[in-house]
């Protein structure tokens, strides 16, 4: 009954709609109803993404750089993509996890989407490097490491002493 309602809603995607999230057979069954499924924010290794792909459990793979163990593992996951699966990193972060996700996207798929929480921050730790422009784009910082240096004055101001 709910499948028809969801299809009529013309969702961009339905994210991790089944519990537990590693129920890849259940996700595959739901996906066959024509609903775009995004999954992977709770997966921790490339092996789980391989299983997700082999079960055709999602249209959109959403690895989280901090949950999968960093940049190397998320690159392995992004390189697994095949059969028209999209990779849209899950990034509900405001700090180094977000910057690491931007670097991965820039290295592998610069035209990729990124899932990001949007809130107006009281202070900008990264001097505007994580700001979204009027077209919804984010510039990828090109400095060393994660591409930027944090604003030390902001760190000092908001540090708990």
Where are these regions (language model features)?
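Flexible C-terminal active-site loop/helix
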Residues: 92-161
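Catalytic core of soluble alpha/beta enzymes
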Residues: 1-92
């Amino acid at each position: 009954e709910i499948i028809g309602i969801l299809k009529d809603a013309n969702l961009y995607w339905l994210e991790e709609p089944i519990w537990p999230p590693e129920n890849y057979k259940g996700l595959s069954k739901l996906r066959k109803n024509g609903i775009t499924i995004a999954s992977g924010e709770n997966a921790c290794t490339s092996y789980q993404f391989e299983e997700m792909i082999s079960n055709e459990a999602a249209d959109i793979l959403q690895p989280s750089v901090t949950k999968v163990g960093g940049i190397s593992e998320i690159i392995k996951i992004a390189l697994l993509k095949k059969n028209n699966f999209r990779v849209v990193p899950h990034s509900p972060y405001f700090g180094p996890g977000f910057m690491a996700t931007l670097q991965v996207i820039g290295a592998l798929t610069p035209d990729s989407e990124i899932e990001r929480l949007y809130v107006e921050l009281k202070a900008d730790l990264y001097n505007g490097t994580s700001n979204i422009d009027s077209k919804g784009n984010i510039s990828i910082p090109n400095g060393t490491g994660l591409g930027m240096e944090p604003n030390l004055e902001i760190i000092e101001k908001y540090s708990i002493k």
